[in-house]
């Protein structure tokens, strides 16, 4: 007699999700409660892989800036911020801090991933004509996202959504499609925007970094 494959009970999956939600709480440097399901170290590993792929592609497209004056300016300002970050957050002393300068005058952007991997787009300077202090405030904000584990927070939101999709799929006997959707969500986790709470927190922390 043929038997159907055993699939997970939707109630068991729901229980796992609920336990994860209840136990996945941490406290940010400003005292804010964070929903985090992934360890900071795991977030750093994922971020490092994504960063190296991005930089490799930019290098192949000849989009990395090598102008000595620009490189020196960015290195001087980010270097000062990193030294303050390491002093105030000693665990970040083990990070592989680095910064890539992207030759893209149309893009006004900068970011810092978990683990201290940074990128700065030349549109920041060409379009905004930033002073050193203004640039320091922007990078202080971006570095604060990494210090406050905002990458892990974003990834956790995606993981929770993926788990919810899996529960729905199991309950509707469509687990294959559910897991495919969960995988897709996990893959785009690093590109999700930060929450408004995280942005406000980075504003506060970044201002402190930039003014020390």
Identify the role of each PLM range.
Residues 2, 24-212:
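A Zn2+-metalloprotease active-site environment signal
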Residues 1-25:
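Sec-dependent bacterial lipoprotein signal peptides
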């Amino acid at each position: 007699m043929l038997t159907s494959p055993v699939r997970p009970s939707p109630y068991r999956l729901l229980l796992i999700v609920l336990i994860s939600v209840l136990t996945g709480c941490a406290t940010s440097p400003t005292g804010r409660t964070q929903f985090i399901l992934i360890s900071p170290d795991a977030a750093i590993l994922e971020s490092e892989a994504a960063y190296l792929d991005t930089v490799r592609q930019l290098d192949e497209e000849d989009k990395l800036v090598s102008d000595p004056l620009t490189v020196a300016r960015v290195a001087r300002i980010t270097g000062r911020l990193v030294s303050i970050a390491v002093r105030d957050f000693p665990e970040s002393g083990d990070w592989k801090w680095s910064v890539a300068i992207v030759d893209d005058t149309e893009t006004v952007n900068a970011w810092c991933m978990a683990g201290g991997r940074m990128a700065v787009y030349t549109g920041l300077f060409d379009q905004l004509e930033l002073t050193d202090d203004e640039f320091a405030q922007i990078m202080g904000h971006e570095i604060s996202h990494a210090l406050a584990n905002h990458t892990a927070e974003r990834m956790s939101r995606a993981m929770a959504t993926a788990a919810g999709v899996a529960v729905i799929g199991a309950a509707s006997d469509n687990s294959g499609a559910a897991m495919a959707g969960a995988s897709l969500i996990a893959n785009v986790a690093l590109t999700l925007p930060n929450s408004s709470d995280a942005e406000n927190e980075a504003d506060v922390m970044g201002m402190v970094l930039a003014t020390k």
